């Protein structure tokens, strides 16, 4: 199972979308950004940048933060959406989304 520490933001939503597409069992833990919960001690222990999203993979106790890294981790773990023959093409679009599209969506949020 995956624990997803998230908030209703574009970066938080993209991880839950992928988890749904992968049909993976997960639990969402909502971090209230308005109440500054991202700065509490417990969350700071798993997110060195105090940002969402973060996942905790309960199968192997791995913690992954940053949305792009999480997307890649999940795609590799579940062997879906990251084809070997088009790996670099997919990676280009993931990085493009993280670097350009994501920040614009965050500003519109």
Which functions belong to the PLM regions below?
Residues 1-109:
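GST-like domain detector, emphasizing the conserved glutathione-binding G-site
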């Amino acid at each position: 199972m995956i624990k997803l520490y998230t908030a209703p933001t574009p970066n938080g939503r993209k991880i839950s979308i992928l988890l749904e597409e992968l049909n993976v069992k997960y639990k969402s833990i909502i971090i209230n950004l308005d109440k500054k919960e991202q700065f509490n001690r417990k969350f700071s222990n798993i997110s060195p940048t105090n940002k969402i999203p973060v996942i905790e993979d309960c199968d192997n106790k791995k913690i992954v933060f940053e949305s792009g890294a999480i997307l890649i981790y999940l795609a590799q773990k579940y062997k879906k959406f990251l084809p070997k023959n088009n790996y670099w093409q997919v990676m280009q679009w993931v990085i493009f989304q993280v670097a350009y599209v994501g920040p614009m969506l965050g500003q519109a949020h």
